[in-house]
A protein has these predicted regions:
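Core segments of cupin and vicinal oxygen chelate
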Residues: 5, 13-53
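Short, conserved structural micro-motifs that define repeat-unit consensus positions
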Residues: 10, 45, 113-115
């Protein structure tokens, strides 16, 4: 099954203040490579060599979602989202947090993803870019 994965994509971090977070990560050597929105959420990708952080700021007035902590998920790239999800289900994982893949044509240039839950409650994102 490991041949399905192309590599590490990113670690997501919730933030209450996008500008403050971007300033902090730029100050320590990060580079903002993309900014986007998902509904009313603000999103930014900050690169450090091979590591990418996805900063997520909830809509104005909303708190960071309860139970997700400051690191809500990590993501891995796949070439074929349907094939990867089928292989994971075949391996006995049935804790997908989204009932089907999500297609987001306007987020970071276009992507589709599917989330499932690991044994300790961690959220894992399968990510295919357009």
């Amino acid at each position: 099954m490991k041949e399905l994965y192309k590599g590490f994509a990113h670690v997501a971090i919730n933030t209450a203040d996008m500008a403050e977070s971007i300033a902090f990560y730029e100050k320590i050597g990060g580079e903002v490579t993309a900014r986007s929105t998902a509904g009313e959420k603000q999103l930014a990708l900050v690169a450090f060599g091979g590591l990418v952080l996805e900063l997520i700021q909830p809509p104005a007035g909303e708190l960071v979602p309860s139970g997700t902590g400051s690191i809500p998920h990590f993501a891995v790239y796949v070439d074929d989202l349907e094939k990867a999800a089928a292989a994971i289900k075949e391996a006995g994982v049935h804790t997908f947090t989204t009932p089907e893949k999500r297609v987001l044509p306007d987020t970071f240039g276009g992507l589709q993803n599917w989330f499932f839950t690991g044994p300790s409650g961690e959220q894992i994102e399968l990510l295919q870019m357009f």
